[in-house]
Amino acid sequence: MNPRNLLTVIAAVGALGGLVACSTSGDTSETASAASASSEVSQTGSTRPTLTESRLQPPPLENEYTTQGRPEVMFDPCTWISDEAVSEAGLDPATRRRGQDVVAEYTFLTCDFDGELRDLSVESGNVAWEEDLQRYSGSSEPLTVNGREALLVQDPEQPGVCGIHVRTKAGFVMFSASRTFEGAEAGLQRCDGVLEIVTALEPEIGTEN
């Protein structure tokens, strides 16, 4: 091959390599940007940040037993309540765990927390508020929590539990608190401090619910 032609080929190959390198660099940058955007969507794609740990995720909300006439439960206590709110309520965020979820003719999504003086179960359901009022008409009294309609329940069938039910658009959220051994030793009465716990956690439900 003529030396001049050889130099021309080498120069062309070098230029092509530079174009490929630039193209590859651009693709990598775009891929990284896309991955970053995907990560952001996973954090902000819902109406609010939620916990993503697999063991905390709720079950599917539809099955052959689900009654279509009831509204869908949006607030999931195990993935919506922040660690900061749990700590503010005097509970240990590290004890967060799913309780006994119910998805049938009605739905209740459940999360349990432990504390030094009290343990707490939070159940978010789509049973109508009116049904709840009727069920506990003889063992409850009305109250408000952060301006939200609520019910203080002292069920005679559960003497160790103090319940506060908070109305939502889907139905209500049931906060059920029980004293630990240390709480009983400290002289806590059945409902001592429970309203304060619920007051700290209620904002996590969200005004949209």
What are the roles of these predicted feature ranges?
Residues E141-N209:
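A short, solvent-exposed beta-edge/loop patch
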Residues S23, P77-T79, T110-D112, V161-G163, ...:
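Sequence contexts marking disulfide-bonded cysteines in secreted/extracellular proteins
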Residues M1-I10:
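Bacterial N-terminal signal peptides that target proteins for export
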Residues E88-L151:
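Short, solvent-exposed recognition patches
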Residues G18-A21:
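C-terminal motif of bacterial Sec signal peptides marking the signal peptidase cleavage site
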Residues S23-V102:
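N-terminal "mature-domain start" segment
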Residues E84-A89, R118-V122, A170-G171, V198-L201:
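Extracellular/mature segments of secreted proteins
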